[in-house]
Amino acid sequence: MAPDEEVVDSPTGWVAKHIQEYVESGGKKGHRWQGVPTLLLTTRGRKTGTLRRTALIYGRDDGSYVVVASIGGAPKHPKWYLNLVDDPMVQLQVGPDIMSGRARTTEGDEKERLWREMASIWPQYNRYQEKTDRQIPVVVIDPV
């Protein structure tokens, strides 16, 4: 991802506002949202090639970042998740720190363990899983 590439932020109103505050403050504002840590994830659009940015709750696992592709328990995966499945190279902003990362979807015991950890941060994830037929992915992003 080139530094001069245009980035399109989430069109969802409250998410766009969150991203704007996060970016404009250099990560000083917006890193915590409703008492939980959030990061900004930038993926490359799988159809357009456009860089797309969203804000997500995150956890840590050793030196990696963990996010959940819940979209509130919607019936389909979020677009950011489909984008990183297609191209796992992403960019993160965590507070003031900006870094590149490689994303991967967890499975089996690792997914179960990280799901529990993420649900301890944001308990609504369990409700989201109950209301959808799809298995909500848990994604690990390793800084590179």
What are the functions of these language-model segments?
Residues 1-34:
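Extreme N-terminal tail/first-helix region
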Residues 3-5, 71-125, 131-135, 143-144:
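Short, structured beta-strand-loop surface elements
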Residues 26-28, 53, 126:
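A generic local structural motif
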Residues 30-31, 57, 82:
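Short secondary-structure boundary/capping segments
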Residues 33, 48-50, 84, 133:
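A generic structural micro-feature
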Residues 36-72:
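Short beta-strand segments
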Residues 38, 136-138:
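Short hydrophobic/aromatic beta-strand or adjacent loop that forms the aromatic wall/cage
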